[in-house]
Amino acid sequence: KGSSGMMSMVAAAIAANRTKKGASAQAIRKYVAAHSSLKGAVLNFRLRRALAAGLKSGALAHPKGSAGWVLVPKK
């Protein structure tokens, strides 16, 4: 899977969290680790890159400030 695959996993992790404020990076990491074969440093690297790309493109947003929880913004 490419970066779009990781972005879809991040979006699925946020949706699975079922809270209005989104999901923490730790919760997203746990979800991706449980639902993919990525582990350790590779998982952390790909997750950081996917979060950064999603925030930059507007596909993801921080509900409060520039750190913490991440959510998929409403269109």
From Swiss-Prot:
Keywords, A to Z, come to: Chromosome, Developmental protein, Differentiation, DNA condensation, DNA-binding, Nucleosome core, Nucleus, Spermatogenesis
Domain (H15): give its ranges: 2-74
Q: Name one GO biological process term.
A: cell differentiation
Please give one Pfam family short name.
Linker_histone
Disulfide bridge positions per record: none
- Classification via SUPFAM superfamilies: Winged helix' DNA-binding domain
Q: Which GO terms describe its molecular function?
A: DNA binding
Q: According to its UniProt record, where is this protein mainly located?
A: nucleus
| PROSITE patterns noted in UniProt | H15
- Intracellular or extracellular location(s): Nucleus; Chromosome
Tissues/organs with expression: Sperm.
Keyword Zinc-finger attached: no
Q: What family classification does the UniProt entry report for this protein? A: Belongs to the histone H1/H5 family.
Protein function = Linker histones are implicated in chromatin remodeling and/or transcriptional regulation during spermiogenesis, the process of spermatid maturation into spermatozoa.
Protein's UniProt name: Sperm-specific protein PL-I
Task: Give the species.
Answer: Spisula solidissima
The organism's lineage? Eukaryota, Metazoa, Spiralia, Lophotrochozoa, Mollusca
